[in-house]
Amino acid sequence: MTRSAKKGPFCDAHLLKKVEVASSGKDKKPIKTWSRRSTILPEFIGLTIAVHNGRQHVPVYVTENMVGHKLGEFAITRTFKGHAADKKAKR
């Protein structure tokens, strides 16, 4: 089920504080966050946010098309190594 429209988008308070500081200054360092559940807001456009994927922080540059999505959608958590090769096909 989706979130109720009357509640508005969710974003962690500590992330909003970091975004306000980064957007007011001219610092281009990525903002580190573990908050994959936060919704991308219009204030995030043009910033680079390093989203944790369980192992490392993946840098995500926020564009206009990403507004409304969650940060976790852009930091993939699973690595696909490929299916096992078929031994019969190799012969």
From Swiss-Prot:
Cited Pfam families: Ribosomal_S19 (PF00203)
NCBIfam families listed in its UniProt record: rpsS_bact (TIGR01050)
Organism of origin: Cupriavidus necator (strain ATCC 17699 / DSM 428 / KCTC 22496 / NCIMB 10442 / H16 / Stanier 337) (Ralstonia eutropha)
A GO biological process held by the record: ribosomal small subunit assembly
GO CC list: cytoplasm; small ribosomal subunit
Matching InterPro entries: Ribosomal_uS19 (IPR002222), Ribosomal_uS19_bac-type (IPR005732), Ribosomal_uS19_CS (IPR020934), Ribosomal_uS19_SF (IPR023575)
Family: Belongs to the universal ribosomal protein uS19 family.
A GO molecular-function descriptor: rRNA binding
Assigned keywords, A-Z: Ribonucleoprotein, Ribosomal protein, RNA-binding, rRNA-binding
Role: Protein S19 forms a complex with S13 that binds strongly to the 16S ribosomal RNA.
Protein name, per record: Small ribosomal subunit protein uS19
